[in-house]
Amino acid sequence: MLKIRSLTKKFKEKTVLMDVNLDIHSGSVFGLIGPNGSGKSTLLKIMAGIMKPDLGCICIDDERVFDNPKVKRDILLISDDPFYFFNATLKDMKEFYRVWYPNLNDEIYEKYRAIFKLDENKTLKNFSKGMKRQSFIVLALAISPKYLFLDEAFDGLDPVMRLTFKRAISKMIEEKEMTVIISSHNLRELEDICDTFGILEDNTIRTAGYVDETKENIHKIQLAFKEEKREDDFKALDLLSMHVQSRVVNLVVKGDIEKIKNYLNTMDPLMMEVLNVNLEEVFIYEMEKQGYGVYDE
């Protein structure tokens, strides 16, 4: 398990992370969600032991990560802009990574290099951003670390390659109980691979939980009434969002759906329809409730 306790990080006078607390269970795929500039990349670097927190700590299996070579051998971070030597080829980087990760599997490397159609003898500096991303994904899959951290994992991948990568990750989690943490601005990409998530906003984790459980606890409901309704009529509900237009009401509500429906039925609606929500909507509604200006109507 990865545990984060009271973590704070500043750059000069700017606070990037403040009192972050989080538990990530082994064998899970955790989606780190947040707006641009929220500190996701910094948090991943601290998780990987590349950067030291000013306060607090990160522990993996009850051992501190920073300045701990034993723990770091089990961690691989693929950043949004991965490091490579100026004239290095993919083959060169494979051998470089093998020094730090001697269990790098050549069979897996060749399998995914062929799938991604990458020439291992060409210099990475001449690759497109997408091809560079694919190259380091191939290395990550070949290394199969116990803890894999991915910053903007799907950036530069076409839909087929994204699906291939997701399937490979899922297979490795089943076989090796690998723990994967993915940050992405594309929440729809995370929804079908992540089982847990955390929302990083205003320098800290505001909400965290299981994806399915959270989605099951948030409901989008459309109603129509004979008479006009006011916002006060729905104040007994745990509302994330509400739009009242005369006799038509759109709600986003947290809680047990049967209890919510029973309450709304006492208001004798002409029509009531419960709609599914996706992870992107969960993020938007939670952020709005926290007072973050996601969009204006």
Please place each PLM-identified region on the residue numbering.
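Conserved structural motif at the start of ABC-family nucleotide-binding domains
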Residues: 2, 17-19, 72
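The feature captures the beta-strand-to-loop junction immediately N-terminal to the Walker
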Residues: 30-35
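Helix-to-loop junction immediately C-terminal to a conserved catalytic motif
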Residues: 48
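Conserved ABC transporter NBD signature motif
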Residues: 56-71
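ABC-family P-loop ATPase nucleotide-binding domains
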Residues: 79-135
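Catalytic Walker B motif of ABC-type/P-loop ATPase nucleotide-binding domains
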Residues: 148-152
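ABC transporter nucleotide-binding domain
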Residues: 166-255
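C-terminal coupling/interaction segments
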Residues: 252-297
